[in-house]
């Protein structure tokens, strides 16, 4: 299988500890809502076109997760949920975690998705390639 690069520069699929996953780099956007939303939409289209089920980790470090950004994130997740067995999120504040978890549970297609929050991307990737939820 050949490696491709996503709009954000991530290799697809990304090999890690004997497994494969996909990483979205949505960090370092600061308060630039338009920038992070634009990247999200481009990554969504890319991921759907790959037609492959992979654990997904998303880096939100140094990006302000406004209500609008979180809403767009939930919408993106609903569109790609059939391709994601597990979701690891990195760089979310306590309040961001609370908001995201609440909205994921409200979503019919996302409520059963295994989601974990991490401070370290390596921990997120290790969990995603493990057999355990």
Set out the residue ranges of the language-model regions.
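Amphipathic, Lys/Arg-enriched alpha-helical "gate/interface" segment within cytosolic domains
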Residues: 2-133
